[in-house]
Amino acid sequence: MNRRKFLQTASAMPAAAAAAQWPLSAFAAAEGGNAWRMFEVTTRVELLKPSGVSKIWLPVPLLADKDFHKSLGNTWSAPGGDVRFVTEDKYNMGVVAAEIPAGVDKPALTVVSRFATRDREVDISKPNGAPAENPAVLKLNLQPTELIPTDGIVRETSRDILKNVKGNDLVRARAIYEWVVDNTFRDAKVRGCGWGDIKSMLETRNFGGKCGDLNAMFVGLCRSAGIPARDLYGIRVAKSNHGYVSMGANTEVISRAQHCRAEFYVAGYGWIPADPADEIGRAHV
């Protein structure tokens, strides 16, 4: 996976690509000097030992534009194969899927994604008048998943954390965040971002993991307490503004820069980013 920052107008996209509608002039300035930065990321998967028909899929960046992220479009290619863009409606995710027939030497799928991003900050000292979230979205982000249940030991742990906590959801989420930071740790032996199997972590009392585990723990404990929360998977594309080498992309090749973080929702504040894994990880820089 390769990343390069680009500052020129993107060239015309092939008809098969998802074309963006955001002119570069829209990113010329940002409130408070929080400038937009534009990136191009190329992701390529090549199967070295194919057997029969090859199927490859790759995710694309966020489909819905945010105040910290805008999509500028995606292009893709899979020589000798058929490619289609698929939208997963439940979580509003986009995937490029390729099917390449047997006999193609080293079948491969390449996706080039262009997007703009800027620093994200939420002032939690007071409500900011954020618009109310769609109730269906909040309901979705209170639901259990296979690896993030909200009953049993997860709910018991959440209740124990909050038993003496008084205050609104912001105060309660902060207490959960601090518990995760105080009780979990980064385990370098865990592959990738981890599985995020929080029930097993709590049952075994093995609180070591990677970003996918530690942020999933925060999300599950929040959901069990009735606080909408979700984990977001992506990849780091820029250097850390604070000088943390392991918390930024320090080369053009970002194949190992995958990261998971979390966010939770509080009425009047909107979605608030949280990353206990990076809080813990700073001790390992």
Predicted regions and their residues:
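Short beta-strand segments and strand-loop junctions that repeat across beta-rich extracellular domains
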Residues: 262-269
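Active-site neighborhood of thiol-dependent amide/isopeptide-bond enzymes
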Residues: 164-173, 178-260
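Acidic low-complexity segments
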Residues: 88, 108-187, 191-205
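N-terminal export signals
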Residues: 5-27
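Intrinsically disordered, low-complexity N-terminal segments that are enriched in acidic
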Residues: 10, 27-121
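Catalytic Cys-His active-site segments of thiol-dependent hydrolases/isopeptidases
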Residues: 272-279
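Conserved small/polar residues in nucleotide/adenosyl-binding loops
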Residues: 283-285
